[in-house]
Amino acid sequence: PDGRLYVAWCDGQPAGCIALRRLDGTTCELKRLYVRPAFRGRGIAGAMMQRILDDARAIGYTVMLLDTLPFLTSAIKMYRALGFYDIPPYNDSPLDTTIFLRLDL
């Protein structure tokens, strides 16, 4: 009840996925946002993000965290447009280039 996993379908094929997991009673983490290359540019990532944000709020989370990597420029641009901002590391990612972001829901 406090997490989500979605698969987006387009033209009868799996086009992408997104997940949400609980970190604590008020904080969740966005995981596994991915859209297959053949389906990019159709607004699928944005639609999945809106659904997961709506769900997070409905569950009662007030903060969403995520980690990503610098080469995922399109995703980072979308996250920032949605209001995510940089924060210090919140997990023990083994990659020193990991970017950590937060959104106040």
What are these regions (language model features)?
Residues 40:
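Glycine-rich ATP-binding loop(s) of histidine-kinase-like ATPases
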Residues 12, 43, 60:
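Conserved G/P- and acidic residue-centered "switch" motifs that form tight phosphate/ATP-binding loops
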Residues 49, 56-68:
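Conserved GNAT acetyl-CoA-binding A-motif
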Residues 79, 84:
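Conserved active-site tyrosine of GNAT-family acetyltransferases
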Residues 37, 65-75, 92-97:
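Conserved beta-strand-loop-alpha-helix junction that forms the acyl-donor binding cleft
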Residues 1-31, 36-37, 49-51, 55, ...:
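Acetyl-CoA-dependent GNAT
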